[in-house]
């Protein structure tokens, strides 16, 4: 089983398939040797039950594998032998370093086997939790920094090597945990300042907050910068003046929007000390050109000569009040989203609605300002940059009151102006035999001094020589040296050997040299190296489909006849007798990736040279979505992907046949091609329509794709109880009801057993929002995706298995909503009800919806009103009870409802026009009622009362049956709430056992009084209760 070099005999195959089948979990990893041979096995028709051997798996083979072991074992061994020569092994020495709360740095070394064949690496990372998705990052380079991780979370990662012919198995999995981050309390207004790695910016006396922020959390372990609460700043100014004994006539000047009058000149220092709040405002004072003797008002000791500096008061006020004006906060999350050799796209997070422009500044590495640009969107693209150069950028938000503090700098380096992997050394050239004694052969080559991008190598080059006995071995032998020659020893006499060499600088390995064949025979020289020339000579090696090319393979002028075979894709040409060259003229097509020229003689010796060709793919452009549904004031992203057809395509978007004017373009080059995204912020009705992604290549060819943006303004449900009420009405019960509930944990994919409710779930999940992205991530098949986007759908398609996933995505879209309202206040008067409520201060777009209907009437429709104010007036019937629900909403969804009630008037109001006689009788009735109430109050003092009177006044005069008043604490929480337990209402005053007391109040039912106490039935309506909402 372990001797892969030879195919097993028929008898051995039977034994392996039966007796030895249980040993495969031990053998498979060994013979796979860190490489994945599955692709080859599939091409050779190996059955599914035996593919575990090809992938080096440790899984046991099932009973059904007996057949494929008998039929496919030889094919499996052939693929494994082939993979030894063409597949790299897994990356080695994978290590984790430089952990933060949101990032990790990964390093690795080249594979132990076939490192020269590696073209790129792929990183796989996921949270170490059940059901978490795997993030795939292609073309990573060691060391690699992976960003966007969650703090205080455990992750697992592996790496995979890729060559042109296959891949390795994943490397040994690495487990690590990101660092925790302390989330500070929420600021009164806005959010604290965060660093680029997600940590909060710490402030103290040495590191003060920028203008517009104050250092809070004093006395705790964490002090951070929060935006100034402008509603309290002047109050603090005034209180400071009072404490400093400011004269009453000057107190009106202790406001940030006031200056100090001349009559208060002698109190200038008191005004300065309170207005400055002890902060250093020197930078602002210098900008305002405050005279040097008067600058001590802007910094310690905050005292100035009043006569000399009183004229500077207006400048002081400008600086002191700047921190309390509604200036923009610092721009957050500045990122360099795409980088090329001469351009870079900068994006950031726009959190405020009143920004009029962003100032974007570009700096050189030394800090010199190069460019200053203005952007009305939260993205900007710098062009005409220098290749392979370090830059930094920062962004400042500006509104009508002024500019906020600058963001943190984001640094980046433009790409070199060379071809892919230009930092690798070039392949060694002119590999040849220096001398040959038979068992020992000296081979030499020209030294490598430059990289593929023409830069000079700066570190020592290590050469690796590979040689293989073509007849008796399948394993390459390697030798390493820092010289440009090496002696291969102990060769088998008269044997043929393949030999090639690679160069390595640090961890970057070149492509292989040409391959020569050596005959281990005394004084047997090698063959000359062929030279391949391709016309036209594209420096980047990229050719267009259908382009006419000429490939020439030639030898130096020698007198010996040699055979020359030139192979390009499916084309093979040979030289004429005695000719030292061969030419192939053809058109470039997709089958061409390498030009191979082999020179051979009659002794079996060869010298093989190769040259790689890169072919452009046929131009195509596709839209990510054919239809995009958006809501009023929502942002939309129209994405198209362009593949092939030109090195520098021009990509633009059109709307209804004209160039799109509202929005901005974000372009990014990826391994798959170009990804273009057209962003439109705060969509309006006029933005709806058909959008085209138009791509024009350098040769003038044009391709395009279309997508429709569908606009909708209705975001509120007809029924305020939303999805949950629909599910309850449809009879969905048990755990399946959790999928309908906003804020609850949805069912995991493994536990879905709700197919009996599938039709009902899909009905209630119907929504105008587009949930396609969520559904795709949840594994919903393409045939069922129309249910996620509100499109037309064929009832003949069965989507019951995806019902819970579709419902979960529908619910998630509603969770991205404003927070709920609080402190609802109701004031009723003469048939009108005024309702007010509180809502957190925010600059985000929102409005409120108020639902109301008569209580205790489930058949009456809800009435719905919308407002942008935090109050509303309703016309209601004063003789009816009403239930009211209020929610906050925006384009992303709406909050949970806050319920309340409007009680009816205790007595209908009478008209005031009935005259004085009506007033007289009202007074008489009130006097009679007063006398009656007073009499009942006197009677109630007596311990024993006749039954009718006692029942009438509701007395419970049994001292052993105490009473209690309670209200339902879950009122207004229709989806849940705490239970309430009422203890101590039952039993007598005598001492009972603990068990008896426990069982007495734990009963879940309302329990009537003892049947033996009929004479006092009115006194003891219930003994105790446990209520569950």
Swiss-Prot record:
Topology versus the membrane: Single-pass type I membrane protein
Disulfide cross-links: 640-693
Pfam families hit by this protein: DB, fn3, ig
Residues covered by the WR1 domain: 185-227
GO cellular component: M band; plasma membrane
Domain Fibronectin type-III: 90-181, 330-417, 427-523, 817-909
Cell location: Cell membrane
Intervals, Extracellular compartment: 23-918
SMART domains, alphabetized: FN3, IG, IGc2, WR1
Disordered: annotated span: 988-1021
CDD domains named among the record's database cross-references: FN3 (cd00063)
Superkingdom to which the source organism belongs: Eukaryota
Repeat in keyword set: yes
InterPro entries attached to this UniProt entry: Cys_repeat_1, DB, FN3_dom, FN3_sf, Ig-like_dom, Ig-like_dom_sf, Ig-like_fold, Ig_sub
Record keywords: Cell membrane, Disulfide bond, Glycoprotein, Immunoglobulin domain, Membrane, Repeat, Signal, Transmembrane, Transmembrane helix
Segments on the Cytoplasmic side according to the record's topology features: 940-1029
Biological process annotations from GO: sarcomere organization
Signal peptide (UniProt feature, chain positions): 1-22
Known glycosylation sites: 36, 93, 120, 165, 257, 374, 409, 442, 482, 507, 552, 753
Transmembrane segments: 919-939
Biased composition (Polar residues): 998-1013
Record keyword Ribonucleoprotein present: no
Protein name: Ig-like and fibronectin type-III domain-containing protein 1
């Amino acid at each position: 089983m372990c001797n892969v070099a030879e195919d097993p005999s028929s008898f051995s195959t039977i034994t392996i398939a039966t007796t030895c089948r249980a040993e495969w979990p031990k053998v498979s990893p060994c013979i796979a040797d860190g490489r994945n041979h599955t692709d080859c096995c599939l091409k050779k028709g190996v059955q599914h039950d035996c593919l575990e051997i090809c992938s080096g798996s440790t899984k046991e083979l099932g009973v059904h594998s007996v057949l494929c072991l008998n039929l496919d074992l030889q094919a499996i061994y052939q693929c494994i032998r082939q993979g030894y020569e063409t597949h790299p092994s897994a990356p080695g020495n994978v290590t984790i370093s430089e952990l933060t709360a949101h990032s990790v740095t990964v390093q690795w070394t080249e594979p132990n086997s076939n490192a020269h064949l590696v073209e790129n690496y792929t990183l796989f990372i996921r949270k170490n939790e059940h059901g978490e998705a795997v993030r795939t990052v292609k073309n990573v380079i060691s060391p690699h920094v992976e960003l966007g991780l969650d703090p205080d979370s455990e992750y697992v990662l592996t790496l995979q090597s890729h060559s042109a012919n296959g891949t390795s198995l994943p490397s040994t999995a690495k487990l690590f945990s990101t660092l925790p981050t302390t989330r500070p309390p929420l600021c009164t207004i806005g959010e604290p300042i965060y660093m680029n790695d997600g940590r909060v910016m710490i402030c103290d006396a040495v590191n003060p907050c920028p203008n517009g922020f104050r250092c809070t959390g004093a006395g705790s372990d964490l002090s951070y910068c929060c935006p100034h609460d402008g509603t309290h700043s002047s109050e603090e100014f005034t209180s400071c003046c009072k404490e400093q004994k400011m004269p009453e006539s000057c107190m009106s000047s202790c406001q940030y929007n006031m200056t100090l009058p001349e009559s208060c000149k002698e109190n200038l220092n008191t005004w300065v000390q309170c207005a400055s709040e002890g902060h250093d405002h020197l930078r602002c004072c210098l900008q305002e050109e405050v005279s040097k003797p008067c600058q001590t008002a802007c910094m310690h000791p905050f005292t100035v000569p009043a006569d000399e500096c009183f004229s500077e008061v207006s400048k002081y006020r400008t600086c002191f009040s700047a921190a309390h004006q509604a200036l923009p906060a610092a721009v957050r999350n500045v990122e360099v989203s795409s980088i090329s050799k001469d351009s870079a796209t900068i994006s950031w997070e726009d959190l405020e609605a009143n920004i009029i422009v962003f100032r974007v500044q570009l700096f050189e590495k030394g800090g010199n300002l190069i460019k200053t640009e203005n952007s009305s969107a939260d993205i900007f693209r710098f062009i005409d940059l220098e290749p392979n150069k370090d830059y930094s950028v920062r962004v400042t938000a500006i509104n009508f009151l002024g500019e906020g503090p600058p963001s943190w700098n984001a640094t980046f380096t433009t790409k070199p102006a060379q071809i892919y992997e230009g930092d690798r050394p070039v392949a060694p050239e002119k590999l040849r035999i220096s001398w040959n004694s038979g068992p020992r052969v000296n081979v030499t080559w020209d030294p490598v001094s430059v990289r593929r991008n023409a830069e000079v190598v700066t570190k020592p080059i290590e050469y690796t020589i590979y040689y293989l006995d073509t007849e008796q071995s399948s394993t390459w032998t390697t030798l390493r040296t820092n010289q440009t020659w090496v002696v291969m020893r102990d060769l088998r006499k008269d044997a043929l050997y393949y030999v090639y060499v690679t160069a390595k600088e640090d961890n970057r390995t070149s492509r292989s040299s040409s391959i020569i064949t050596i005959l281990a025979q005394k004084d047997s020289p090698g063959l000359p190296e062929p030279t391949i020339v391709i016309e036209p000579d594209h420096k980047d090696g990229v050719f267009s489909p259908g382009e006419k090319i000429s490939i020439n393979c030639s030898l130096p002028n020698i007198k010996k006849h040699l055979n020359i075979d030139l192979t390009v894709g499916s084309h093979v040409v040979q030289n004429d007798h005695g000719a030292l060259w061969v030419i192939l003229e053809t058109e470039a097509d997709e089958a061409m990736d390498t030009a191979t020229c082999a020179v051979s003689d009659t002794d079996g010796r060869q010298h093989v040279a190769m040259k790689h060709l890169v072919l452009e793919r046929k131009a195509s452009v596709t839209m990510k979505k054919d239809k995009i549904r958006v809501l009023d004031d929502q942002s939309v992203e129209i994405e198209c992907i362009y593949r092939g057809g030109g090195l520098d395509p021009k990509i633009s978007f059109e709307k209804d046949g004209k160039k799109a004017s509202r929005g901005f373009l974000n372009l990014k080059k990826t391994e798959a091609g170009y990804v273009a995204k057209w962003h439109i912020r705060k969509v309006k009705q006029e933005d709806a329509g058909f959008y085209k992604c138009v791509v024009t290549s350098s040769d003038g060819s044009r391709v395009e794709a279309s997508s429709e943006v569908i606009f909708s303004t209705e975001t509120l449900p007809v029924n305020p109880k939303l999805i949950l009420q629909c599910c309850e009405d449809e009879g969905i019960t048990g755990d399946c009801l959790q999928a309908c509930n906003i804020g609850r944990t949805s069912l995991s994919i493994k536990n879905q057993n709700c197919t009996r409710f599938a039709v009902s779930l899909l009905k209630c999940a119907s929504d105008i929002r587009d949930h396609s992205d969520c559904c795709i991530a949840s594994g919903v098949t393409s045939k069922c995706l129309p249910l996620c986007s509100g499109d037309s759908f064929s009832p003949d398609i069965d989507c019951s298995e995806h019902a819970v996933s579709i419902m979960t995505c529908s619910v998630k879209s509603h969770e991205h909503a404003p927070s709920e309202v609080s402190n609802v206040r109701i004031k009723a008067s003469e048939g009108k009800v005024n309702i007010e409520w509180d809502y957190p201060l925010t600059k985000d777009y929102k409005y409120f919806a108020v639902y109301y209907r008569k209580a205790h009437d489930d058949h009456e429709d809800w009435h719905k009103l919308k407002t942008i104010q935090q109050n509303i007036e309703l016309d209601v019937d004063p003789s009816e009870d009403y239930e009211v629900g209020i929610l906050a909403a925006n384009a992303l969804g709406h909050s949970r409802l806050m319920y309340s009630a409007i009680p009816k008037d205790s007595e209908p109001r009478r008209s005031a026009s009935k005259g004085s006689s009506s007033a007289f009788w009202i007074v008489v009735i009130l006097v009679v009622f007063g006398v009656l109430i007073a009499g009942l109050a006197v009677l109630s003092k007596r311990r024993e009362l006749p039954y009718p009177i006692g029942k009438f006044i509701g007395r419970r005069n049994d001292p052993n049956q105490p009473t209690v008043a309670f209200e339902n604490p879950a009122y207004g929480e229709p989806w849940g709430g705490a239970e309430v337990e009422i203890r101590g209402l039952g039993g007598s005053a005598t001492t009972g056992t603990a068990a008896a007391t426990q069982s007495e109040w734990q009963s879940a039912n309302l329990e009537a009084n003892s049947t033996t106490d009929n004479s006092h039935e009115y006194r003891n309506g219930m003994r105790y209760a446990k209520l569950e909402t």
